[in-house]
Amino acid sequence: MSSTFYLEILTPERKFFWGDVESIIVKTPTGEMGILKGHIPTVAVIDIGSIKIKKDGKWFEAVLSEGFMEVKQNHVIILVDTAEWPDEIDENRARAAKARAEERLQRRRSEAEYIQSKAALARAMARLKVKGKYN
């Protein structure tokens, strides 16, 4: 009996991942959420951070931006703005984005700028964290 479920990760630009997996761990606004075969149907908000995917007994990690996840009948669909494998992350670009976001947070002019800067900082830090694990 198979202990896998089907996972799809989609962005506006591409089908990032698809296939049978044993487990995933995603970041939500309330903490990490693990999914195994047979998980109850649910819809969840995905927060900026990493996704850990267990496939064929091995763990893989990628960075996801914000989005949504639907779990139903051993099929998980994740819709996010961006998704990147560690080898797709430009570390210098992520460091520059982090510095820009930190500077904007220091001189924020509006609530909207603050929210945008916090999101940009979270994306840059997630990229650097995952990239740092796989250098």
Curated annotation (Swiss-Prot):
- Cellular component terms per the entry's GO annotation: plasma membrane; proton-transporting ATP synthase complex
Q: How does it sit in the membrane?
A: Peripheral membrane protein
* Principal subcellular localization: membrane
Entry GO MF terms: ATP binding; proton-transporting ATP synthase activity, rotational mechanism
Its annotated compartments are: Cell membrane
InterPro entries given in the database record = ATP_F1_dsu/esu_C_sf, ATP_synth_F1_dsu/esu, ATP_synth_F1_dsu/esu_N, ATP_synth_F1_esu_C, ATPsynth_dsu/esu_N
Q: Which residues form a coiled coil?
A: none
Q: Which domain of life is it from?
A: Bacteria
Query: Which keywords does UniProt give here?
Result: ATP synthesis, Cell membrane, CF(1), Hydrogen ion transport, Ion transport, Membrane, Transport
Q: Does the keyword Cell membrane apply?
A: yes
Transport as a keyword of this entry, yes or no, is: yes
Main role? Produces ATP from ADP in the presence of a proton gradient across the membrane.
Q: Which family does it belong to?
A: Belongs to the ATPase epsilon chain family.
Outline the subunit composition: F-type ATPases have 2 components, CF(1) - the catalytic core - and CF(0) - the membrane proton channel. CF(1) has five subunits: alpha(3), beta(3), gamma(1), delta(1), epsilon(1). CF(0) has three main subunits: a, b and c.
Can you say what this protein is called? ATP synthase epsilon chain
Give the species. Answer: Acetivibrio thermocellus (strain ATCC 27405 / DSM 1237 / JCM 9322 / NBRC 103400 / NCIMB 10682 / NRRL B-4536 / VPI 7372) (Clostridium thermocellum)
Gene (UniProt): atpC
